């Protein structure tokens, strides 16, 4: 049976409060016993002053999300110069790079300056062979290539007429063709590193300038996603995550991909993780933080497999500082396990890789809530004159408050205190309820080599998870037990990429991807039949009593969204004697569907009513007025206007041009230009209205979010790179800082809240 509390009455009827909600503006009057919906709420946007207005608004947005980043090529390049023992360059040297594991080969001839460039190599270990008539053949083995890097391999060939191979092992080389500051973590380290939760983001913090965010509970507003990293002090949502060159960030909230566990699983399915922290080339953009690139494993000519499990529990744990001494250590058991298999489907041509990871966890979380003590449950509170006279030994020194009979079922939601007494009718309630998390991740990748100059791969990854959360402590949540929530998340990531050498000096990469992320947080109704909502059949809402912990289910639950991002991108690179030119374009279509509910289950607020003319006799007026069922406000949803579902749409187009120019043997110039275009966010069914200027508008304007979107979003790049010798050791580098526009769609959702 629904229970409804009366608003406080005073002799002169007046409006107490007007609350703008996510869908309704609700007024509360002192002589009414119900909420009245005045008119539908609207999204607000800054008034139009110039074409840069939306940019300024986005910078100030609470839930700022930085839009799409065009990824640098996931393939590596080998460059170098061939000389003779006197230092003279040698033209016409046959350079061949090959991989034993996949059979991939690339070949080129040095130009008149002795330079060569071989591109299109997936991350891995390669060998380079240099040969020319009348010179000894030289072979360099063990060259480890990382994604998006250009590794210099400079050789000096000795004169010799006898056929002879000189084989040496490669030293660690530095990419001198870019000013980007980055670090790579290779496959062996990904497996061996003792990472908590086997989380991808734990690898990022190994790099300078990267710090983890506090390990708190996943935020409601991030749909349960957590595990973020801050790069160079920027917001975690400004960190872009790429999987095989495809953007994997949530298009609405900007958070990086993760399941309900808060971890980004799947490290055993990755061959490399690369973290870029600053001074990016033009093929990166639109993100104010850094970039984390993950490259999935591929198969080889040999069959390989793995089977593993990690177990962790609380057997050797010490008690938390807040745990009660009389209680056992809160339960904690975590199991992570997985298996993988890889091999050839057709020797030297088709390879596959499959990976599975599972995550199971049961953990009790210690929580401290402020609730009424045993005397307050009986209507006995300390007096404002002599509060120390009220205690369990002398209850006669307490002030008796007439408890409204309708509050009995609400007081039953509040267990008695078992911790410190606050001396105002409240005390601490320390509990440790159990939560559980289940997550499963699967990855399948197939690579097909048409020839040494043409290859294709397809990859699909799914992450399905759910988590029972005993406390939604993140505001507006509660640490009072008995109001758990259920988080669910299912993420799909699909990508196809075609790579081909059009000519020896021209390489093209075409990619297509679809990301679909569905996340929700719902109420576990543990008190059926108890409701304060204006809508029938809703679970219990929330009581907000000043000076106490919130009681009930969070007013922002249920919360969820389903987002789909379509990505099409193409990048062309061409090499001449002195220039390496890259051109690229990317088109992204963003679809985000879901409700933005607030207060759908009802929210009563109790506080000191003495400013409104009421009298209080105790030292805790808010609790006193609660016991008398006198709220200051109620937030609810108009039963006749309760549809908050919205289907948002946006298109983002990005393009760039980058030229690496070798000016001299010791100086190179890296110059680039990037352009980003963001369409005006829209709602598929026209259910979007905006108050463009609150000072002059008489009502909302139905239509798109902004009157005008930014049109000039150009971002130049310039870097100087020098070498102390032909061995290509960098001695200087400079690049002007640039900052890019943020996604307009996330601003729409932010304002909507």
What are these regions (language model features)?
Residues 368-439, 474-479, 526-561, 586-660, ...:
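Feature marks flexible
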Residues 170, 307-313, 354-358, 458-462, ...:
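Transmembrane beta-barrel strands of outer-membrane/channel proteins
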Residues 518-520, 679, 685, 728-753:
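Surface-exposed extracellular loop regions of Gram-negative outer-membrane beta-barrel proteins
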Residues 1-53:
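N-terminal secretory signal peptides that target proteins for export/translocation
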Residues 231, 294, 339-343, 444-448, ...:
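Residues on the lipid-exposed face of transmembrane beta-strands in outer-membrane beta-barrel proteins
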Residues 164, 172-228, 235-282, 286-293, ...:
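Acidic, glycine-rich flexible loop segments
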Residues 227, 269, 288-290, 335-339, ...:
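Hydrophobic, lipid-facing positions within transmembrane beta-strands of outer-membrane proteins
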Residues 26, 43-45, 51-183, 268, ...:
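Periplasm-facing N-terminal accessory domains of Gram-negative outer-membrane beta-barrel systems
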